[in-house]
Design a protein with these regions (language model features):
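Positively charged n-region of N-terminal signal peptides that target proteins for export
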Residues: 1-6
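Bacterial N-terminal signal peptides
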Residues: 8-16
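N-terminal capping segments
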Residues: 26-91
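Aromatic- and glycine-rich peptidoglycan recognition patches
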Residues: 35-38, 107-110, 127, 131-181
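Short, structured beta-strand/loop micro-motifs enriched in basic residues and often containing a Trp
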Residues: 97-106
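Structural motif
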Residues: 118-119
Length: 181
């Protein structure tokens, strides 16, 4: 009789444990959304900090704001959004992304006229459709698109505020960062 009691108690405890376990490996407990304007704006403010810190360009760089700063274009965007989401329920879809990945997978495409400060600008060579560069949108003014990016050219190395004409063929797409909570 005692053995049956312990067997039933064991089966009861085991069934409680079994039912409480989540065996559905396909479920994802996160929700993916377009980044709220407040987070995009905060990301832009961090880009301004990088710019004001005389940050230089370095391919593959993702230096935090407080170190000897060297960063590339996608690293700038990733780090600014990471900082913007500190103390919020939000996070990036993945922790490191290229400009092309952000364009293809981690953003919702919008028209230039719908862009908010801190949203994403995808760029590439004028004669190519490939995305090879990314920047944070500042504003559209007098037919020019103003942005902050990290680049290395003959006359630029680092994070700067620049602009191109809105019709410039280097612009490939515009987007809102997708985030999760």
């Amino acid at each position: 009789m005692k053995a049956i009691f312990y067997l039933l108690l064991f089966l009861f405890c085991f069934s409680i444990l079994f039912v409480s376990c989540n065996f559905n490996n396909d479920s994802d407990d996160t929700t993916e959304i377009d980044c709220p304007a407040e987070i995009a704006s905060r990301a832009f403010r961090f880009a301004e900090l990088y710019k004001d810190s005389d940050t230089v360009y370095e391919l593959g760089g993702q230096a935090p704001v407080r170190s000897a700063i060297a960063i590339d274009c996608s690293g700038l965007v990733v780090m600014c959004y990471k900082y913007a989401m500190v103390d919020t329920k939000y996070s990036l879809l993945v922790s490191d992304m290229t400009a092309a990945y952000m364009c293809e997978t981690a953003s919702s495409h919008v028209a230039l006229e719908q862009m908010r400060q801190g949203d994403l600008i995808f760029m590439g060579e004028a004669d190519s459709s490939n995305v090879s560069h990314i920047a944070l949108f500042d504003r559209l003014e007098n037919g020019n698109v103003y942005f902050i990016d990290s680049t290395k050219k003959d006359d630029i190395s680092g994070v700067t505020c620049r602009y191109y004409a809105a019709s410039d063929s280097r612009f490939k797409s515009f987007g809102v960062m997708k985030i999760q909570y």
